[in-house]
Amino acid sequence: MWEHIIGHTEQKKFLQNYLQAKERPHALLFSGAAGLGKRTLALEFAKALLCFQHNGTDGCEACRLMNLQDGNLSHPDFVLVQHEWDDKKDRLRDTIIIDQIRELTAKTALAPVMSPTRVCIVEDADTMVPAAANAFLKLLEEPPAGWVIILLAANVNRLLPTIMSRVVQLRFQAIEPQLVEQELQARQIEPAKAAVLARISEGSIGLALNLAAAKGQLDVFECRKQAATFLEALPLAMPMNYLAGRSWLDKKVQREQALLLVQLWQLLLRDLMMCNLQLYDRIYNIDLLDELKSQSSGWQLSALKQALVIVQEAYDALVSSVGMKTTLETMALKIDKIYKE
């Protein structure tokens, strides 16, 4: 069942048993990092729940009157709650607001129209504002008949404990790199590139596919080259000399590229630590193994640990919309200092 979704065998088995059960929980929580396949499996599970001919298997193609895919998420018994467009800021909101939960609550008073049950998926449930979370809690306290609610969350620590106590949690773990690599190759990505992407994506098939598709300034191998060049320059020059004039420090460059660069610095520093410890089989950037071995000899293990903390702080600052140029320059100066101590 759902063979096209790689990994997550136990989660798929649980959901198959759920479909066959006479009594079942009304609310599920799919938790785990972004890109692991939570949304994909939730949509497939929703199809099976909405199919009026299913026998504890996938929804059949004959009666499926909907196509729960991006761009076409319409079905009278299906509700999707996700980040909405903010006209004032001209971008997607980064939270679920109370009006969305109020609208969901109103819909739960309705019985199924054409399916045996009604299904709601709440994406990024961990981003509900406090008022929305409290309103959602009331919905769980008096669960609507004929409904199955599926929460998707990357950080369960941001969910109310009282919400956590009223859902059944399915934890999604990173997928084996070998499985990610096989999936990438099946999508016509060259083996050498697939091997690297499978590892630097850290078991996230969604991230691996996004990295594989990225072009131009967001090409992962081009960005990695820039990140590696910065680390190589540490013994020879002040990092500010390296950063000066770099095109990716320009304000016109998307923050997305800066975030990718910082993530690649994290992975390269992690690999340098693995080389320092002679754990070569744990290297992510396997195609750079010789260069990493050579560079690692110039690093103290304690300095690498500190550098990883500094890079994480830079990433958090960028996510919080702190100035990109200032953040990267501060990070570079701190890393240079600990490297040369």
Language-model features, listed with the residues they occupy:
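AAA+/P-loop NTPase substrate/partner-engagement loops
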Residues: D58-K88
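Conserved catalytic/switch belt of AAA+ P-loop NTPases
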Residues: A109, N134-L151
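Conserved alpha-helical scaffold flanking the Walker A/P-loop in AAA+ ATPase domains
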Residues: L15-L19, T95-V119, T127, A135-K138
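Flexible beta-alpha connector loops of hexameric P-loop NTPases
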Residues: K88-I97, A125, Q169
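Conserved D-loop-proximal element of ABC-family nucleotide-binding domains
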Residues: V129-A131, P161
